[in-house]
Amino acid sequence: MLILTRRVGETLMIGDDVSVTVLGVKGNQVRIGVNAPRDVSVHREEIYERIRHEKDGDVPEAAPGQGADPQ
């Protein structure tokens, strides 16, 4: 794994077509912007895993705090 240090407003490039820019840092959260061609999917890891499981026909149960809120 390549580990990089970037400041707010700085960008890193992945190949020729994908850029990742640090938009802000607040506490332990980092806001990033991803610029990629339309044919490149960009997802948060948990969303990517859900999509992958749905494609395989294996839908995992919602994690605590996610999904419908029973009342």
From Swiss-Prot:
Belongs to the CsrA/RsmA family. Gene3D superfamilies: Translational regulator CsrA. One of its GO terms (biological process) is negative regulation of translational initiation. Homodimer; the beta-strands of each monomer intercalate to form a hydrophobic core, while the alpha-helices form wings that extend away from the core. This is Translational regulator CsrA. Its main location: cytoplasm. Residues 50-71 are annotated as: Disordered. It comes from Halorhodospira halophila (strain DSM 244 / SL1). A key translational regulator that binds mRNA to regulate translation initiation and/or mRNA stability. Mediates global changes in gene expression, shifting from rapid growth to stress survival by linking envelope stress, the stringent response and the catabolite repression systems. Usually binds in the 5'-UTR; binding at or near the Shine-Dalgarno sequence prevents ribosome-binding, repressing translation, binding elsewhere in the 5'-UTR can activate translation and/or stabilize the mRNA. Its function is antagonized by small RNA(s). PANTHER family: CARBON STORAGE REGULATOR. It is found in: Cytoplasm. The keyword Transport does not apply. It holds the Pfam family CsrA. Keywords: Activator, Cytoplasm, Repressor, RNA-binding, Translation regulation.
